[in-house]
Regions:
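Short, hinge-like loop/turn segments at secondary-structure boundaries
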Residues: 152, 220-222, 244-247, 332-334, ...
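Extended hydrophobic/aromatic segments used for targeting, binding, or gating
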Residues: 216, 220-256, 260, 345-352, ...
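His/Asp/Glu-enriched, well-ordered alpha-helical/loop segment
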Residues: 185, 304-315, 319-338, 342-343, ...
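Short aromatic-centered micro-motifs
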Residues: 22-23, 264, 483
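Non-cysteine beta-strand/loop elements that form the S-adenosyl-L-methionine
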Residues: 64, 256-274, 359-368
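Conserved, mostly hydrophobic/aromatic
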Residues: 51, 146, 198, 259, ...
Length: 494
């Protein structure tokens, strides 16, 4: 990825009053200061930023890139306020674009946690007949099938048609299947869209073997992002056979692909009432009244210890407070390093344990905006410690921000806005005492790079039409003028 030297003139660093020049050479920040163009050499390119703000490029610390690419192509049912409303959206699509034989209508984005009516196969069947319809929830933890949709996915029958967690997740390989070439084109399009928002890298936690598809995509020219590819337990032996450790650059990918962490999902989600909690969900009884523990400690601890011995960090999905307690217990028992993904509901004691154990909290602030009403109903009396970002920061916990795309948009400015404002759509802030300050939110979005640009750092930069620290800066809609990866433009709009 060798590129000629590039001088960004009249650049403004975050929070700075005066402009400087930024010299990029050999894929890194070579110098920051005044009048650098004179000594940059005859072959150097110059681009006048005209006072625009330049900062390290943004990372999304939790994505599912194929799911995100698929969601961008699927029927959007996120606006549905009831099962009946979702069915009307489905019928409108079927009327406009009838299915061709052998295909299914797949929608994405419903959240039934507050619906007045239950999503069932019978309801869908009464409306769509023999049409295979599959609607995936916004949190990816369940799906709603018509009877024909069940048959399409290879399921003979189901009592309700609403499949959650372990019933649903094995079916994603069928429901999500499209030819590699099509999926790769959609992922490339999604990658370019991310670059247009200042993104230079993602942590890829797709539920599949992630190295092979990204090797293929990069070889085919998808070079808009750096990718840190997580590995799931079924594919762990393949990574270990290559003797890859977390942080290793994968050979033959132009420095774009790194081995990421071991990913383990230990509980469910709030919307499905499967996040594993110390206290039961209101109105639920029986074995799952506290949610679902997908991976018990007796399996989790040795798995994490094994990965640690082989040089992998661990990324442990935990949403409910009991799941978080057990995840932290597992970090302590295994000696593993890494992150808890989501960390949505925490006890006060566990906030402190994140800090003492050195466990990173990988959080998705926009989920608080999506889940606030569901949390008020299903975590009533506990929401003061839900999405407790300020408490974690005050305890000295390292935070990284992400989207969990497609659960939230792959746009770090959306995450920063949600973290700082705790509000959306003109509503009052939800638990404003848990807001992050803006500097912390920005620092949690740039993969550990200093906001003021460090000499020697990768030349992965975002060029903005507004300083995010300026009063009234439009955080959620931050205008991004350009993005550079290793000193080459992946997006330029000026």
């Amino acid at each position: 990825m060798s590129t000629p030297p590039l001088v960004l003139t009249h650049a403004r660093l975050v929070g700075a009053a005066r402009t400087v020049d930024v010299l990029l050479r050999d894929g890194r920040v070579h110098a920051v200061g005044p009048d650098l163009a004179r000594g940059a050499g005859a072959g150097a390119e110059q681009v006048d930023l005209g006072g625009r703000t330049v900062m390290p490029g943004l990372w999304d610390a939790h994505t599912h890139m194929t799911q995100w690419a698929l969601a961008r192509q699927r029927l959007d049912v996120s606006a549905a306020t009831s099962a009946a409303h979702a069915i009307r959206i489905v019928l409108d699509r079927l009327a406009a674009r009838p299915l061709t034989p052998g295909t299914a209508l797949v929608g994405y984005g419903f959240r039934d946690g507050l619906w007045p009516d239950a999503p069932t196969a019978d309801l869908l069947d009464a409306a769509v007949g023999d049409a295979p319809v599959i609607l995936v929830s916004g949190d990816l933890h369940c799906a709603w099938f018509s009877t024909a949709g069940l048959r399409y996915a290879g399921v003979a029958a189901h009592p309700t048609g609403l499949l959650r967690e372990a019933e649903w997740l094995p079916l994603t390989s069928v429901v999500d299947h499209v030819p590699d070439a099509v999926a790769d084109d959609w992922v490339a399009e999604a990658s370019r869209a991310a670059a247009a928002r200042g993104v230079v890298g993602v942590v890829e936690l797709e539920i599949t073997e992630n190295l092979a598809p990204w090797r293929r995509r990069i070889a085919a020219g998808n070079d808009a992002l750096r990718v840190r590819a997580g590995v799931w337990e079924p594919y762990l032996d393949r990574v270990l056979a290559e003797e890859l450790r977390s942080g290793d650059v994968v050979v033959g990918t132009g420095g774009l692909l790194q081995q990421g962490p071991l990913k383990v999902v230990t509980d469910g989600s709030l919307n499905t009432r499967t996040a594993f909690c110390h206290d039961p969900y209101p109105g639920l009884t029986g074995a799952d009244a506290h949610g679902v523990l997908s991976v018990p400690p007796e399996h989790l601890v040795p798995l994490m210890a094994h990965a640690t011995r082989k040089g992998l960090t661990c990324a442990i999905h935990a949403i409910g407070d009991h799941a978080n307690t057990l995840a932290l217990d597992a970090f302590a028992a295994s000696g593993a390093r890494g992150s808890v993904e989501h960390a949505q509901l925490l006890t006060d004691a566990d906030v402190a344990r994140f800090a003492s154990l050195g466990v990173v909290a990988s959080v998705q602030p926009e989920h608080a905006m999506d889940d606030r009403d569901v949390a008020d109903r299903h975590w009533a009396g506990r929401t003061g410690r839900a999405f407790a970002l300020a408490s974690l920061a005050a305890a000295g916990v390292e935070l990284v921000l992400g989207s969990d795309a497609p659960v939230a948009p792959l746009d770090p400015w959306v995450a920063v806005s949600a973290a700082v404002e705790r509000a959306r759509d003109g509503r009052e802030p939800w638990h404003p005492e848990q807001r992050l300050d803006l500097l912390t939110a920005l620092r949690s979005s740039v993969d550990g790079q200093p906001l003021t640009l460090a000499v020697g750092a990768p030349a992965d930069l975002a060029v903005l039409d507004a300083d995010p620290l300026s009063a009234g800066a439009p955080l959620r809609e931050m205008p991004v003028a350009g993005t550079l990866l290793a000193g080459r433009w992946t997006h330029r709009g000026f």
